[in-house]
């Protein structure tokens, strides 16, 4: 079994422990004051380093999914920044000490913590049409497989002048397919890789996205109605359940139902307002600043 327990370490731990001496040498060479990691593997490595007295500076982990992923319980860092206070019992049950848990939230870039008006985002920045309902479809950094089918279904159902912006990420193939498919449809805007995701979020009325931790958090902080599409089993499933249970998003595993949910949100002011209110209660836009403050305190030994 690969899962660890309080009595034994997993093969994952021992594999990452092999990097301990190299990481210790790198840290010493560059004279770092503190280490922050959003990933399990370096946390495993630094746990080994602490055990062997090879790590002499503080180390902090930042969780980027709305669940306690496997193997966190066999790590031993100074603090664990987690997405939400409701996750504390799950982490504690898995064996992470409660006094090390800080529910600051998932940090996002400052652009996502500021909202531009739709007029500024659409007209002055992105040159998109004003006064029309607009969907934003996020494919993820590599695009998701059923994007072309989903886009065709959504475009077919948009009969009231709605526009669709599709961000394809790094998937050049799906971008070419969609540009060809919607070449004559002026209400569908195909975007490849872009550094302006925050602006597109400001411009849209409803966002479709897979339930990844970072994209979901960015949408939550932006206070945008969210329709979650089919998750990759594992962390994304946990993220979807966390958001759904708190009315931060709606979701369905069926493509046609996903389209229907987005249409309902864009057409029903009351539904959007209810989700917006829930998001305002749960979002944590100050996460990044709180983490920076924590690191400064640890470095200054306060």
Q: What is the meaning of each model-derived region?
A:
Residues 1-30:
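Conserved N-terminal ligand/cofactor-binding loop architecture of enzyme catalytic domains
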Residues 118-120, 128-204:
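Donor-nucleotide binding loops and adjacent catalytic segments primarily
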Residues 202-212:
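Acidic donor-binding loop of glycosyltransferase active sites
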Residues 204-205, 223-225:
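A short alpha->beta transition loop at the rim of the catalytic pocket in nucleotide-sugar-dependent
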Residues 244-250, 254-271:
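C-terminal "capping" alpha-helix adjacent to the active site of nucleotide-linked donor transferases
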Residues 271-285:
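A short, well-ordered alpha-helix in the C-terminal region of glycosyltransferases
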């Amino acid at each position: 079994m690969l899962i660890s327990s309080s009595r034994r370490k997993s093969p994952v731990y021992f594999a990452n422990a092999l990097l301990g001496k190299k990481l210790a040498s790198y840290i010493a060479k560059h004279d770092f004051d503190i280490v922050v990691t959003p990933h399990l593997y370096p946390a495993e490595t630094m746990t080994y380093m602490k055990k062997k007295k090879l790590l002499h500076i503080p180390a902090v982990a930042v969780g980027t999914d709305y669940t306690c992923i496997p193997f966190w319980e066999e790590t031993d860092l100074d603090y664990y920044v987690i997405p939400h206070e409701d996750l504390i019992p799950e982490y504690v049950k898995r064996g992470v000490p409660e006094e090390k848990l800080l529910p600051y939230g998932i940090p996002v870039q400052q652009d996502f913590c500021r909202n531009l008006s739709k007029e500024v985002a659409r007209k002055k920045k992105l040159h998109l049409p004003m006064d029309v309902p607009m969907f934003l479809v996020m494919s993820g950094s590599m695009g998701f497989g059923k994007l072309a089918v989903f886009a065709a279904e959504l475009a077919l159902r948009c009969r009231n002048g709605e526009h669709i912006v599709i961000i394809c990420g790094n998937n050049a193939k799906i971008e070419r397919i969609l540009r060809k498919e919607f070449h004559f449809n002026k209400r569908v805007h195909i975007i490849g890789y872009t550094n302006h995701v925050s602006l597109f979020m400001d411009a849209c009325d409803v966002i479709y996205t897979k339930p990844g931790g970072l994209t979901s958090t960015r949408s939550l902080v932006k206070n945008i109605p969210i329709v979650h599409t089919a998750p990759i089993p594992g962390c994304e499933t946990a993220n979807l359940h966390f958001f759904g249970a708190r009315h931060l998003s709606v979701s369905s595993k069926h493509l046609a139902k996903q389209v229907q949910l987005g249409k309902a949100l864009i057409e029903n002011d009351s539904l959007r307002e209810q989700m917006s209110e829930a998001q305002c209660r749960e979002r944590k836009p100050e996460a990044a600043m709180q983490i920076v403050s924590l690191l400064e305190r640890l470095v200054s030994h306060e």
